[in-house]
Amino acid sequence: MAASIVRRGMLLARQVVLPQLSPAGKRYLLSSAYVDSHKWEAREKEHYCLADLASLMDKTFERKLPVSSLTISRLIDNISSREEIDHAEYYLYKFRHSPNCWYLRNWTIHTWIRQCLKYDAQDKALYTLVNKVQYGIFPDNFTFNLLMDSFIKKENYKDALSVVFEVMMQEAFEVPSTQLLSLYVLFHCLAKKTDFSWEEERNFGASLLLPGLKQKNSVGFSSQLYGYALLGKVELQQGLRAVYHNMPLIWKPGYLDRALQVMEKVAASPEDIKLCREALDVLGAVLKALTSADGASEEQSQNDEDNQGSEKLVEQLDIEETEQSKLPQYLERFKALHSKLQALGKIESEGLLSLTTQLVKEKLSTCEAEDIATYEQNLQQWHLDLVQLIQREQQQREQAKQEYQAQKAAKASA
């Protein structure tokens, strides 16, 4: 019953107007300059036969020797077809489970995602990203954005959402462009889907909260509120551990209280910041559903206590007040704060997807310029690091050759 009330509340909250699509029927967020691959393609790279590199890696693994990061880098760099993507995936896995697994280079990860996009293998890119522990794929924000945008262009929001969840799990919301793209994907999915498992609610909640904390505007504060509401629901229904286990979230109880604190902060703010009615409706639906469910459970608990005697009741009186017992207070605070926000004109009626789309149009171009500049610096630094590795490899080979010749000469003289 409680779950159905929440779903109805969230469905009403999502009656928003979807943003207009491009004339071609597809949504384009990142500019052509951002996704352009010419600078990446024009970089200096070594040309090798993929079969020779694969054979070298196989022999090295068989001899139980470490494979160098240069070898796996060259293999990924020389992919030239969709079929070779599948072969390279195997060697990425093998390298991840080798002694040198910690030395998978950032440019190798970026190149892997680029190659997957180039040869229409986004599914492989996503698979290795989701299974990051097995493949070592921990991209930077620029690379995350490229993959996310590729799914948005195909209107594949399910996989775009999976990328957002991975950004959240890897705590990679430092860059504003990633925050904006992620929020756009999240609200696009929330506008269409009405039924969630508690795991999905937790993932949505965390993915809304973390970038929302970094956006100091109406979208950011509304995202915080929405995220706290979903996480608070999970906390009350599944327990606090379900919220923070294997998640980048704190293990301190009180997520619904934090949602109310967001309302208080916006109400007290002198800035022109509003909370979206959509997010407020979700929090209201969660509080009402949980409060009604709590009342029913209290009646059942009272019957159980009458049957079991007073000893258990005395023990319960010694237990610290729980979040469950605070629900009526939370609901009253919510109603009072909602009225205050309404009186102050701080409730935004426009939907979150529409607001986020406007924010993307306003801010993304500036964010792109910063990202592209950083990417170009990374390309230069990656090239310098690669040159150093190649020089070091040549020195080691020369040293090994000299040692071998010395040993051979010593044996001949003996």
From Swiss-Prot:
Keyword RNA-binding: yes
One Gene Ontology term, aspect cellular component: cytoplasm
Subcellular location: Cytoplasm; Mitochondrion
Transit peptide interval: 1-36
Expression by tissue: Overexpressed in hepatocellular carcinoma tissues compared with adjacent non-tumoral liver tissues (at protein level). Ubiquitous.
GO MF, one example: tRNA binding
Keywords for this protein: Coiled coil, Cytoplasm, Mitochondrion, Repeat, Ribonucleoprotein, Ribosomal protein, RNA-binding, rRNA-binding, Transit peptide, Translation regulation, tRNA-binding
Swiss-Prot/TrEMBL GO biological process terms: cell population proliferation; mitochondrial translation; regulation of translation
Domain of life according to the entry: Eukaryota
Coiled-coil spans in chain: 368-414
Subunit composition and interactions: Component of the mitochondrial small ribosomal subunit (mt-SSU). Mature mammalian 55S mitochondrial ribosomes consist of a small (28S) and a large (39S) subunit. The 28S small subunit contains a 12S ribosomal RNA (12S mt-rRNA) and 30 different proteins. The 39S large subunit contains a 16S rRNA (16S mt-rRNA), a copy of mitochondrial valine transfer RNA (mt-tRNA(Val)), which plays an integral structural role, and 52 different proteins. Interacts with NOA1. Interacts with MIEF1 upstream open reading frame protein. Interacts with METTL17.
Family recorded in the similarity comment: Belongs to the mitochondrion-specific ribosomal protein mS27 family.
Purpose: RNA-binding component of the mitochondrial small ribosomal subunit (mt-SSU) that plays a role in mitochondrial protein synthesis. Stimulates mitochondrial mRNA translation of subunit components of the mitochondrial electron transport chain. Binds to the mitochondrial 12S rRNA (12S mt-rRNA) and tRNA(Glu). Involved also in positive regulation of cell proliferation and tumor cell growth.
Descriptive protein name: Small ribosomal subunit protein mS27
Annotated source species: Homo sapiens (Human)
High-level lineage: Eukaryota, Metazoa, Chordata, Craniata, Vertebrata
